[in-house]
């Protein structure tokens, strides 16, 4: 199984910062998962929450703050003095690191935070524009999201890039929706994955990925179920268990 770094090496550095991404890359992770949102002036930035409150020294909704306002915040100090001065990264920052280390990126598009179809289209279009401008290899990108509308948009904007449908718990009959968005993979909370579901999805041709299994002994059997990727806050525990790849 592939071991991917969830929001970077989030167990060792503040999540979704360049420190966390670089630590994951230097540790040897080939895949990094992160979250993409738009600043108020339309720039793709990497942050998970709807607001900056939890992970910075500021407050307010991400989409209400300009890039200049977002970059003025400290995104590292909450995790310790050593990370003082870490900024909310741009998507372009992570792409540069990915080029340096040959990384693959799982870009979760955070559009479930809005009901606006226009806002969803804006995020998808802006993300596509950055990837095209940077000429980043399509085979090293995976788009993912809980909001199926987003994956429809990315199918339109960049049909050559793979798409993964995120669920907490996979619904009883997922195949029609997966076919509709031409999905490559299904991502779910490891706690709710069932053996029969995993095997039926693999039989139907879909990859099965799980987030965030931080206890290797509890998912050791997932490889037998056909699970291809574990997205964890702490990749080191899988190296310790000789399950790192």
Describe the predicted segments one by one:
Residues 1-245:
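Phosphate-group recognition and catalysis centered on beta-loop-alpha active-site segments
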């Amino acid at each position: 199984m592939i071991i991917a770094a969830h929001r970077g090496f989030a167990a060792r550095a503040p999540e979704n910062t360049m420190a966390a991404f670089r630590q994951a890359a230097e540790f040897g992770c080939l895949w990094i998962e992160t979250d993409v949102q738009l600043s108020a002036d339309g720039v793709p930035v990497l942050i998970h929450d709807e607001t900056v409150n939890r992970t910075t020294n500021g407050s307010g909704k991400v989409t209400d703050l300009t890039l200049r306002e977002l970059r003025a915040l400290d995104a590292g100090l909450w995790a310790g003095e050593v990370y003082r001065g870490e900024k909310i990264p741009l998507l372009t920052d992570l792409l540069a690191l990915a080029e340096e280390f040959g990384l693959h990126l799982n870009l979760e598009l955070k559009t479930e935070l809005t009901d606006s179809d226009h806002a969803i289209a804006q995020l998808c279009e802006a993300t596509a524009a950055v990837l095209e401008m940077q000429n980043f290899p399509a085979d090293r990108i995976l788009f993912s999201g809980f909001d199926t509308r987003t994956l429809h948009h990315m199918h339109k904007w960049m049909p050559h890039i793979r798409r993964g449908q995120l669920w907490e718990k996979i619904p009883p009959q997922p195949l029609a929706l997966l076919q509709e968005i031409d999905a490559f993979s299904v991502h779910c909370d490891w706690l709710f994955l069932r053996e029969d579901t995993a095997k039926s999805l693999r039989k139907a041709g879909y990859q099965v990925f799980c987030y965030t299994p931080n206890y290797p002994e509890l998912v050791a059997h997932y490889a037998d179920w056909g699970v291809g990727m574990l997205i964890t806050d702490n990749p080191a525990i899988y190296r310790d268990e000789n399950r790192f790849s």
